[in-house]
């Protein structure tokens, strides 16, 4: 009877594996790094349109850049002399997988640690320079980061140099426990000695600058300038809201909010930072 006859097979909508493989061979692949999505305006941007400064052409958002990219944008070509590359962590807590994580970060960034330190010329002005890189374990501050920055200040005192630091950090490095927290006091003491010597210290806040770095040397500069829209704070927004039981302003912990309340002296476009650094260092008795 027709009523109980076998139904025809359903039409296949999804191609089987053989069809998939034949189709995929004929479709050109788009390279992974050809486009970037802006975290602010959500637009897809052709990488070449970002330019060397990595700024969104639609909303002017400043993408996070590596220490090497920052260096190329800032210093006179060929003038940078890297220092303190021989310092290594002793891994005092023998934290599980810490050494593997360090090795992975070194391979990914080309850096030995989360901060690049040395001396350089910026438009002819000689200075001691530190650049933190958030791509290296979120530029967390451990014993090596603290020691390198402390030695940079000590060298600057001996050679009568101004210090310029580009800050970026997720805070203290948990894998080193109390030793990482101690770096806050150690670096702050070095900043004070540099200040007592009558030398200029400029901090440039970049996205993100949080935790122990914010609570110490990031906010201790003689002048504090920042890149637009950078996130700067100590504790996270949700932690603060839970503690105070209040809703915070939408722009809370953005540098524009901090400038409005007197915590930041100026907000400077990334493309203008080189000129601003040279001007401020020269104005405060820089060394050429």
Swiss-Prot record:
Gene3D superfamilies in the record: 2-enoyl-CoA Hydratase, Chain A, domain 1
Pathway: Lipid metabolism; malonyl-CoA biosynthesis; malonyl-CoA from acetyl-CoA: step 1/1
The record's free-text note on cofactor binding: Binds 1 zinc ion per subunit.
InterPro entries: AcCoA_carboxyl_beta, Acetyl_CoA_COase_Trfase_b_su, ClpP/crotonase-like_dom_sf, COA_CT_N
The protein's Enzyme Commission number: 2.1.3.15
Domain CoA carboxyltransferase N-terminal residue range list: 34-288
GO molecular function, one term: zinc ion binding
Subcellular location: Cytoplasm
Superkingdom of origin: Bacteria
Positions annotated to bind Zn(2+): 38, 41, 56, 59
Any one GO cellular component localisation term in the record: acetyl-CoA carboxylase complex
Catalytic activity from the UniProt record: N(6)-carboxybiotinyl-L-lysyl-[protein] + acetyl-CoA = N(6)-biotinyl-L-lysyl-[protein] + malonyl-CoA
Role summary: Component of the acetyl coenzyme A carboxylase (ACC) complex. Biotin carboxylase (BC) catalyzes the carboxylation of biotin on its carrier protein (BCCP) and then the CO(2) group is transferred by the transcarboxylase to acetyl-CoA to form malonyl-CoA.
Family: Belongs to the AccD/PCCB family.
Complexes and interactors: Acetyl-CoA carboxylase is a heterohexamer composed of biotin carboxyl carrier protein (AccB), biotin carboxylase (AccC) and two subunits each of ACCase subunit alpha (AccA) and ACCase subunit beta (AccD).
Protein name: Acetyl-coenzyme A carboxylase carboxyl transferase subunit beta
Natural source organism: Streptococcus equi subsp. zooepidemicus (strain H70)
């Amino acid at each position: 009877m027709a009523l109980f006859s076998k139904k025809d097979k359903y039409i296949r909508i999804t191609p089987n594996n053989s069809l998939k493989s034949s189709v995929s061979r004929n479709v050109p692949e788009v390279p992974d790094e050809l486009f970037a999505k802006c975290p602010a305006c959500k637009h897809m941007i052709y990488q070449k349109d970002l330019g060397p400064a990595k700024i969104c052409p639609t909303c002017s958002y400043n993408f996070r850049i590596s220490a090497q990219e920052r260096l190329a944008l800032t210093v006179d070509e060929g003038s940078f002399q890297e220092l303190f590359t021989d310092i290594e962590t002793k891994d005092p807590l023998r934290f599980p997988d810490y050494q593997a994580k360090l090795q992975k970060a070194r391979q990914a960034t080309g850096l030995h640690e989360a901060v690049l330190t040395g001396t350089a010329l910026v438009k002819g002005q000689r200075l001691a320079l530190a650049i933190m890189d958030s791509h290296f374990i979120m530029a967390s501050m451990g014993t090596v980061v603290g020691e390198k920055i402390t030695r940079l200040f000590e060298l600057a005192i001996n050679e009568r140099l101004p210090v310029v630091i580009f800050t970026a950090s997720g805070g203290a490095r948990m894998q080193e426990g109390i030793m990482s927290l101690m770096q806050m006091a150690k670096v702050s003491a070095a900043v004070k000695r540099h200040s007592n010597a009558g030398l200029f210290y400029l901090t440039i806040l970049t996205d993100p600058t949080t935790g122990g770095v914010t609570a110490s040397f990031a906010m201790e500069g003689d002048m504090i300038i920042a890149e637009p829209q950078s996130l700067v704070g100590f504790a996270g927004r949700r932690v603060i809201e839970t503690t105070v039981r209040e809703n915070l302003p939408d722009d809370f912990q953005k540098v524009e909010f901090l400038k409005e309340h007197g915590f930041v002296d100026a907000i400077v476009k990334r493309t203008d930072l080189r000129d601003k650094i040279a001007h401020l260092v020269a104005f405060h008795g820089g060394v050429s």
